[in-house]
Amino acid sequence: MRGVNAVQTRQTAEERREGVIAAATKEFAVHGFAGTSTMAIAKRVGVSQPYLFQLFGTKKDLFIAAVHECFETVRLRFESVARDARRASDDPEHLLQQMGMAYCDVLTDRNMLRLQMQAYAACDDADIRRVVHDEWTKLYDSVARASGAEHPRRLPDPR
């Protein structure tokens, strides 16, 4: 029986969704798309398997959400680092170097690197292949914009 002062906090659907993606990332990183069971993900996060399908529809949709989150984490980190590094220098080489070091930091979370590898391994599936391609394109474009490397250096006007 709960005491009068007991407070029960309920997660919002978005918080629960984020928790499921985090749990799925760990499972998919280790076992891959084909080798991961939705039951293992549900158990890891403490929800029912039907609830996973209520949130994501299919296992593939959940995998794609985890892949998207992985790439978005890297992309946002690069953009943040580039903004901070730009205070010291707006040289594209400097900014790219700082983003490269940030990537090494991101990869200390082995699940991030493993999930990226598992995403590539799952590219036999056309939907997953399209998502991986789109995420890499967004990442490339983001790095190019954030670093200024997308534009050739302009020569001074000789006039």
Q: Where do the language-model regions lie?
A:
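N-terminal intrinsically disordered/low-complexity leader segments
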Residues: M1-A13
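Helix-turn-helix
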Residues: R16-G19, A23, E27-D61, A65
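Hydrophobic alpha-helical connector segments
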Residues: A65, L76-R110
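Amphipathic alpha-helical packing segments from all-alpha helical-bundle domains
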Residues: E72-R75, Q97, D105-N111, D125-A149
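Short terminal interaction segments
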Residues: H151-R159
